[in-house]
């Protein structure tokens, strides 16, 4: 590799790593395994060391992680939450040992499991839990104190009135993860990919009540700082924390030689699949705290510790067939049917192939011999093809352009990796579609929740959203827990929903990429469902805030005959198909830009946004110098602080309502 090739490869690696950093640290939606990520980072570090002229301060090799999101207040860590350097072989562990001993002489090590969860910092003042934060970028994280307080293994008060800071890993036990996904599947909600994603998503919920319902746990693995006490070793400090009421990291083993360390790593690796929680490695730490002080740290990691990463177990097997499954969002996912093989203690007979690009990139064919592992220790995944074992009888796979469940068009929009079914009648996604249609921001059918929808579907009383308007009292009274009053109330709510405005109907149809704001723009312009269905791709592109993907999505949706039939049946049932007149509503917010933060008492965010847009205003998601008003509800996020810094006018819900009534002029 010459200098120019190295420069291009370094740029490519940085782009990939920054992308995956964003997916992992900011969105909590990783697309690759930790092992694959580590290999990318290792290659970048090696190239930058070989070509130091290309190393820059903003390279991902020089940083700890991703930026925190805006939903929570930022919190600057008392002690920076640095990462650990990684090792993948016994020789690399021995090299770490040599570096340590060159600096401080003989040492004692501890080996402990590396819990696969979400790292947090807990601050205690006078023995009381005061602040809990996520890692964020290592310097500034997110203040998630109310959510962490719902985890029962986190003590709210310590035994002693001490000031201290600890670091721990929040995780979800394997059994709890399986139960949670089972419950989400029953409700028609998207599933978590692995326990780590479930833990991270639960901690970062805006509503602590949601977090409280999730079975989260924590292991404390380090005492970051304490006032008025000294400890000689890490193990001694952990014993103190245990006495104070903390649940400390288990399976710790003290080692006096590097050979003992390697043996402890191997023993931990042998038992990891049988543990009730996920681990993705072992952490090796210097036990003596005074020697840690001497060893210190770099800008991104500690010199006194290293993480050994276990490679994902891979097995060889054969692809018998490739089938396509339709998810609840209409996404078509190719799945490999395999000759059964045991991986990490369980029999695997199917593996995800993600999407058609993944199949094409890896040149996966029916009949191929492949290597399979469990991504995140949970999801079976085809990693690569063993091409030298091909016989010539393998068959190429072609993604269908029709939904295998309902026969509707399966469309892949530009820039998207997945193909989606466009059918309103698709049985694979109908429950989710009806739940969305009945939701508060769409047709707002009070009393029509997931449980009732599930019963209606299982009894064959409905097959699509239009069928709701043909239900009779005799249909509803047969449902479980449905009495006379409940049945009549639901029929009344369904009848009432017929008068909803056009934008709410359009949003309720669940057209891919068309949210409530886009639906408002479209309804305001075209005025009727007939006009919308007749409109061409170019017509939608002329509208503000409607891009090419959204335009293509809505045109494709209405080109599908079964969707047009559903709309026709809605019309026959008496559902409003016109943009309702807003009466005497004036353009009092003309040219004004609003941002909303926190929970409003009398409106959802979409309802408040609709009122603003109807009156000529615009609603954006972030505060800037162009923002005219920030409407603040309960438990506002960091937008409030930014608005104060920029001098943006801040109003509460009562002032907003006064503006709507004309009592206050904007």
UniProtKB/Swiss-Prot annotation:
A GO CC annotation recorded here is:
cytosol
Cofactor needs: Mg(2+); Mn(2+)
Binding positions for Zn(2+) per the UniProt entry: 403, 406, 421, 426
Cross-referenced Gene3D superfamilies, in alphabetical order? 5' to 3' exonuclease, C-terminal subdomain, 6.20.10.30, BRCT domain, DNA ligase/mRNA capping enzyme, Helix hairpin bin, Nucleic acid-binding proteins
> What keywords is this UniProt entry annotated with?
DNA damage, DNA repair, DNA replication, Ligase, Magnesium, Manganese, Metal-binding, NAD, Zinc
Decide whether keyword Zinc is in the record.
yes
Function per UniProt: DNA ligase that catalyzes the formation of phosphodiester linkages between 5'-phosphoryl and 3'-hydroxyl groups in double-stranded DNA using NAD as a coenzyme and as the energy source for the reaction. It is essential for DNA replication and repair of damaged DNA.
Family named by the database record: Belongs to the NAD-dependent DNA ligase family. LigA subfamily.
| The protein, known as | DNA ligase
Give the species: Caldanaerobacter subterraneus subsp. tengcongensis (strain DSM 15242 / JCM 11007 / NBRC 100824 / MB4)
Q: What is the lineage of its organism?
A: Bacteria, Bacillati, Bacillota, Clostridia, Thermoanaerobacterales
């Amino acid at each position: 590799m010459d200098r120019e090739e190295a420069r291009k490869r370094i740029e490519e690696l940085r782009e990939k790593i920054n992308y995956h950093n964003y997916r992992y640290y900011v969105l909590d939606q990783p697309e690759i395994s930790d092992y694959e990520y580590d290999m990318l980072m290792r290659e970048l570090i090696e190239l930058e060391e070989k070509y130091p002229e290309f190393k820059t301060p903003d390279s991902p090799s020089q940083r700890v992680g991703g930026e925190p999101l805006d939903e929570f207040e930022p919190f600057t860590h008392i002690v920076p939450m640095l990462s650990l350097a990684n090792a993948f072989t016994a020789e690399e562990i021995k090299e770490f040992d040599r570096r340590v001993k060159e600096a401080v002489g003989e040492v004692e090590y501890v080996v402990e499991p590396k819990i696969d969860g979400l790292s947090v910092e807990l601050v205690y003042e006078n023995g009381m839990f005061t602040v809990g934060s996520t890692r964020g970028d290592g310097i500034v994280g997110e203040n998630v104190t109310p959510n962490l307080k719902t985890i029962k293994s986190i003590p709210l008060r310590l035994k002693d009135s001490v000031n201290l800071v600890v670091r721990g890993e929040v995780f979800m036990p394997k059994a709890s993860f399986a139960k949670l996904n089972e419950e989400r599947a029953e409700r028609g909600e998207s599933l978590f990919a692995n326990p780590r994603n479930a833990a991270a998503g639960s901690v970062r919920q805006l509503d602590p009540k949601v977090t409280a319902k999730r079975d989260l746990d924590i292991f404390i693995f380090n005492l970051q700082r304490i006032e008025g006490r000294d400890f000689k070793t890490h193990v001694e400090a952990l014993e103190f924390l245990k006495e104070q009421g903390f649940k400390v990291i288990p399976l710790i083993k003290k080692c006096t030689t590097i050979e003992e360390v390697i043996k402890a790593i191997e023993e931990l690796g042998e038992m990891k699949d049988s543990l009730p929680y996920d681990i993705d490695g072992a952490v090796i730490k210097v036990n003596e705290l005074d020697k840690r002080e001497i060893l210190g740290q770099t800008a991104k990691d500690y010199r006194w510790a290293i993480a050994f990463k276990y490679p994902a177990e891979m097995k060889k097997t054969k692809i018998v067939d490739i089938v396509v499954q339709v998810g609840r969002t209409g996404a078509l996912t190719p799945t490999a049917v395999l000759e059964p093989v045991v991986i990490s203690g369980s029999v695997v007979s199917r593996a995800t192939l993600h999407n058609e690009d993944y199949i094409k990139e890896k040149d996966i064919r029916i009949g191929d011999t492949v290597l399979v592992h469990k991504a995140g220790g949970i999801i079976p995944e085809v990693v690569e093809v063993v091409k030298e074992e091909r016989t010539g009888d393998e068959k190429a796979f072609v993604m269908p352009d029709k939904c295998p469940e309902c026969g509707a068009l399966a469309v892949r929009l530009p820039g998207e990796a997945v193909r989606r079914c466009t059918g309103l009648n698709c049985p694979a996604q109908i429950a989710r579609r009806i739940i969305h249609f009945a939701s508060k921001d769409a047709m707002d059918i009070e009393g029509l929740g997931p449980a009732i929808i599930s019963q209606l579907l299982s009894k064959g009383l409905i097959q699509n959203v239009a069928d709701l308007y043909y239900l009779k009292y005799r249909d509803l009274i047969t449902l479980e827990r449905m009495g006379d009053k409940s049945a009549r109330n639901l029929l009344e709510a369904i009848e009432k929903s017929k008068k909803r405005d056009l934008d709410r109907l359009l949003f309720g149809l669940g057209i891919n990429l068309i949210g409530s704001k886009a639906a408002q723009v479209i309804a305001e312009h075209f005025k009727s469902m007939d006009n919308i269905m007749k409109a061409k791709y170019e017509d939608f592109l002329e509208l503000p805030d409607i891009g090419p993907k959204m335009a293509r999505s809505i045109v494709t949706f209405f080109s599908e005959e079964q969707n047009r039939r559903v709309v026709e049946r809605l019309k026959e049932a008496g559902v409003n198909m016109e943009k309702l007149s807003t009466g005497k509503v004036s353009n009092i917010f003309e040219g004004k830009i609003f941002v909303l933060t926190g929970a409003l008492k009398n409106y959802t965010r979409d309802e408040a946004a609709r009122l603003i847009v109807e009156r000529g205003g615009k609603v954006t998601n972030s505060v800037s110098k162009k923002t005219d008003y920030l409407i603040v509800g309960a438990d506002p996020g960091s937008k409030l602080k930014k608005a104060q810094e920029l001098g943006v006018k801040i109003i509460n819900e009562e002032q907003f309502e006064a503006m709507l009534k004309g009592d206050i002029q904007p």
